[in-house]
């Protein structure tokens, strides 16, 4: 059993009631957390000795409204390339999962990395601020608000 598999099993067992998924791809674990359980999950990931994710490496907002679209395909030269600015396309998306906030965590103690993903709806994308858990989230949350309109409740600014 690899360290990644072992960690994924521990995470799934410990957070079975507060997560909506745990995926492993390319030796990277992604824990999908529901918005209502984000803060308690982050505190446990930081404080519990089995995890000790003491460092938030990165936080970013994601807009999935055009995810998977190939507007910038450049496999061949054409006069119709780069159509994003010229054509209007109708895209069907799940409005309950239009946005996501993705957190990249590091456990220096265990030398583990973890990705948390929290999906947010198109209408009023709001999430608890994790600045009380990791102070480094401050500017990242500001940036996600500026770029995507994701509001972080309890943010110091």
Positions of predicted regions on the chain:
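Terminal low-complexity/charged segments
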Residues: 1-157
